[in-house]
Each structure stands twice: as structure tokens, then as C-alpha cells.
A protein has these predicted regions:
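ATP-binding/phosphotransfer module of carbohydrate and carboxylate kinases, centering on a glycine-rich
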Residues: 1-64, 85-88, 107-113, 158-305
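Phosphate-binding/catalytic loop of phosphoryl-transfer enzymes
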Residues: 73-171, 303
Length: 305
């Protein structure tokens, strides 16, 4: 029996599933975040090597094919680096490197027509039509993109607290939430935290949860941030729908990502706004890594004599 490895590498955590050729999972492992742009090549290699070794040790087998879903894989330069990382840790043949939305799409869309909208630390929309054409929107990283993501929500909340602090914006309950979440005494201390050294961006992304709590309690500033996040996510999805000509035929919309899981009201708002007669909008119940397993199985079958 041959085996395959599927890896979902996110900005906050990494999941790996080792499965038999028939798709039955025989081992799994979790690791830290793995993103070339924010963690660096060596850190990504360390995480991928660790989860691969852990699954192989648990099952007592080595995979015959591997598929990696990770942010940034759509850029040719990053994809080449990722393939080299996989080669260094022992995977030279039957290797698939793709973006994180692709594996979520495969995991959640049996017909493989439609799109995945991922909202985690970052965000991206990626889809495929019946003719095999693919399109994406967003996913350009936290400096210039990732609109609507956990980081985007957290960063805007911090901005609004500081604006309210110096009189450029309204007072907001987010100020107290900021102090508690980051364990600081004064809102301006967050500036020193962020610029003072290696400040993990996932800490800002995790601030999205207190933002949602403030919105539920009626804070207008927090509510506006979440409404804007939903609009950005819907825009990304609708852009992919338009570019692929999906409207008018049955298609899936797969919602995935840690921020969607942590902020169900945000996910529900996005799902409502993307509802259409032709669209089957669903939350991804399983793991995106299961989509990577399926892509690895396909690579294994394609290489069979």
C-alpha cells in the first residue's frame, strides 16, 4: 500500500495528514505557522520537516507523493523555493505545491466548480470553472493586501483605538479590549510593542476575537470594522465569480479559515451576502489538509505506470 502526505501550512499553524492510497488517514501532525514572507525560508523548512517526520514516525511509512497548500505558492518565485524546501527534506518526485485556498476548495467542493474564500491570518479567494480556468483575488500579504482577514481586522482596530486616543476618532470599547488582549497599561504601548522587535503578526490577527466581542456588545467602531471586513471578503469572492463566469450554473462557495471559525457572525454575514440561486455556500467542515491529501493522491495516480 502506497501513502501520500497532505500539508496545510498557514500563517498561524500547520497541519499534516498522512493517508493511505485509498484516502484513509493513518497519522496526523500539527506545527507552527509557515509562511515564506513572514517566517522565512529556514523556519518554513523546519516546520514542514517536523510535521513530515512526525507523521512518518507515527505510521512507520514514508509518503510516495506530497501536496503542500501554502500562502504565496501562486507566485512562481515562491513556488520554486517551496519545491526546493520539499526536495531538501526528501520529497523529489510526485510533489504538488499550490495555494492554501486551492486545497480548501478541493476539500469542500466535490464537483470542483466554484471557489474557496479563505479568511484566516490572511485572506484569499480562489476558484475554478467547469472549463478548468482558474482565478484568484486578494492574497497579497499583510503589507498590501489580505483584506478582511484576522490581521486586517486586528490592525484596523488598533488604528481606531489610537485615533480615538488622540481625538481623531470616536471613543471605543476597543481601547479596553486592546489593553487586556496585549497586556499593556496604555494604548500607546502597542506602538512600542509592534515596532520594538519581532512582533508576531498572529498576535494582531488574534485581536479580531475581542473586536467581534465588542461588536456584539454594541460598539459602533468594532461593528464598522467587521462590516468592512465582510464587504472586502465578499468583493474578493464576487470578483472570482465574475472572472470565471460562474453565475448561471451550479457552483460551490467554500468558506474556510481560522478567522471564520473564530468569528461565526462574520462568516454568517459573508455567507448571506454570497447566497444565490446557483450557489451552494458552505462552511468547510473538515480540514483543508484533506484537500492536499486528495491532490497528492491524484499526483500518485497520474504517475502510475
Amino acid at each position: 500500500m502506497r501513502h501520500v502526505l497532505g500539508i496545510d501550512a498557514g500563517g498561524t499553524k500547520t497541519r499534516a495528514l498522512l493517508a493511505a492510497e485509498d484516502g484513509r488517514v493513518v497519522a496526523d501532525a500539527s506545527g507552527g505557522g509557515a509562511n515564506l514572507r513572514t517566517h522565512g525560508e529556514l523556519a518554513v523548512e523546519k516546520v514542514l520537516h517536523a510535521v513530515a517526520e512526525e507523521t512518518s514516525a507515527a505510521a512507520g511509512v514514508r509518503p510516495d507523493a506530497v501536496a503542500l497548500g501554502i500562502a504565496g505558492a501562486g507566485r512562481p518565485g515562491d513556488a520554486a523555493v517551496l519545491r526546493e524546501i520539499l526536495r531538501r527534506i526528501g520529497f523529489r518526485d510526485r510533489v504538488v505545491v499550490t495555494n492554501d485556498a486551492h486545497i480548501a476548495f478541493v476539500a469542500g467542493s466535490p464537483r470542483r466548480v466554484g471557489l474557496a474564500l479563505v479568511c484566516g491570518t490572511g485572506s484569499i479567494a480562489w476558484g475554478r470553472n467547469a472549463g478548468g480556468e482558474v482565478a484568484r483575488a486578494g492574497g497579497f500579504g499583510w503589507h498590501v493586501g489580505d483584506e478582511g482577514s484576522g490581521f486586517w481586522i486586528g490592525e484596523r482596530a488598533i488604528r481606531q483605538v489610537l485615533r480615538g486616543r488622540d481625538g481623531r476618532g470616536p471613543a471605543t470599547a476597543l481601547e479596553a479590549a486592546l489593553l487586556a488582549h496585549f497586556a499593556i497599561a496604555d494604548p500607546e504601548d502597542i506602538v512600542h510593542e509592534i515596532y520594538g522587535g519581532d512582533f508576531p503578526r498572529h498576535r494582531i490577527a488574534f485581536f479580531a476575537v475581542p473586536v467581534a466581542e465588542a461588536a456584539r456588545a454594541g460598539d459602533a467602531v468594532a461593528s464598522r470594522i467587521l462590516a468592512d471586513a465582510a464587504s472586502e471578503l465578499v468583493l474578493a469572492a464576487e470578483t472570482v465569480i465574475r472572472r470565471l463566469g460562474l453565475a448561471g450554473a451550479a457552483y460551490d462557495v467554500v468558506l474556510s479559515g481560522g478567522t471564520f471559525r473564530a468569528l461565526p457572525a462574520l462568516e454568517a454575514d459573508v455567507a448571506r451576502r454570497l447566497s444565490a440561486p446557483d450557489a451552494a455556500v458552505r462552511h468547510l467542515e473538515g480540514e483543508p489538509a484533506a484537500g492536499a491529501v486528495e491532490l497528492a493522491r491524484e499526483a500518485l495516480r497520474a504517475a502510475a505506470p
